[in-house]
């Protein structure tokens, strides 16, 4: 499964990856030389993707990221970063900037186990008269998942409008990621793994007769938009100035069934008496939402001549 970027990097030395659903679609994680995701500095077109609070990168927010990239650079070990926190475990630098000389288009459709399907298409105008160009990429992927409730329906899109002059360039980039997946982050014990490898406790509850049921809307939903404006000017063969403006907007929610939880945890008085029976615990359906914005201005002046780079 080579859908998300961590899964695509799985064959690199010192890289270990995992996917919660077992198909490569949905939540994926990676370690480099044993360092977890919060210790890996990740940039996209020079803009840091690491979450400001957890320092993690939620790869599921931009599904099928590999389809919209022109280059990926993985640097293992301790390193510095000009656009974010320093990297303890590794640095991953990704770029969507690639101007094609000729018009082109492509379509890729694949199907796999557990009703997994990936569909991607791209179109490029190539470099037009007066230096203008445009690129478009769209991907839609779906799966039932290997473990229970690991279904996924995710989409991503890229649109680039740009201009290249003799010493100047201007590029506007829009990236969208849309996620609708089942909750799979609970994990299982070793004994459960030996009994049923596809077991997932998400949404599990029991009725008064002891029969097991599953809440049918145990979902995680998130949409993220990235808008980047990049300007570059080359003074001469040694000096280059680049400036990038970035705005990231994300919003979503997850719906989750909580069984046997204390009433006081949700601000309710305890105990509660119903039909003569006293209760201190109950079952809850929780919906937690997120709405965040991220602004960045990144400006670099670079000098490069012979073996010296500053």
Report each predicted region and the residues it spans.
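Extracytoplasmic beta-strand/coil segments of soluble accessory domains associated
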Residues: 6-48, 61-64, 70
């Amino acid at each position: 499964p080579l859908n998300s970027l961590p899964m695509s990097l799985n064959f690199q030395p010192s890289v270990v990856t995992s996917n919660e659903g077992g198909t490569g679609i949905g939540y994926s994680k990676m370690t480099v030389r044993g360092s977890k995701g919060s210790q890996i500095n990740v940039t996209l077109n020079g803009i840091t993707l690491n979450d400001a609070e957890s320092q993690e990168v939620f790869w599921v927010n931009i599904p099928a990221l590999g389809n919209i990239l022109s280059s990926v650079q993985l640097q293992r070990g301790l390193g510095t970063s000009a656009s974010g926190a320093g990297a303890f475990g590794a640095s991953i630098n990704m770029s969507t900037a690639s101007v094609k000389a000729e018009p082109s288009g492509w379509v890729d459709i694949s199907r796999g186990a557990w009703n997994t399907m990936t569909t991607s298409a791209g179109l490029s105008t190539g470099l037009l008269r007066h230096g203008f160009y445009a690129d478009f990429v769209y991907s839609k992927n779906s799966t039932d998942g290997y473990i229970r409730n690991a279904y996924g329906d995710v989409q991503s899109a890229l649109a680039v409008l740009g201009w290249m002059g003799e010493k100047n360039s201007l590029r506007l980039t829009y990236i969208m990621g849309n996620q609708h997946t089942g909750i799979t982050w609970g994990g299982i014990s070793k004994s459960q793994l030996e009994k049923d490898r596809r077991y997932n406790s998400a949404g599990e509850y029991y009725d008064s007769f002891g029969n097991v049921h599953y809440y049918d809307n145990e979902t995680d939903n998130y949409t993220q938009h990235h808008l980047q404006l990049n300007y570059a000017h080359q003074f001469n063969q040694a000096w280059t100035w680049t400036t990038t403006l970035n705005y990231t907007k994300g919003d979503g929610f997850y719906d989750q069934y909580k069984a046997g939880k204390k009433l006081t945890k949700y601000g309710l008085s305890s105990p509660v008496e119903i039909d003569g029976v006293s209760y201190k615990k109950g079952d809850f359906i929780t919906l937690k939402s997120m709405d965040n914005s991220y602004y960045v201005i990144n400006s670099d002046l670079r000098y490069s001549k012979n073996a010296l780079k500053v």
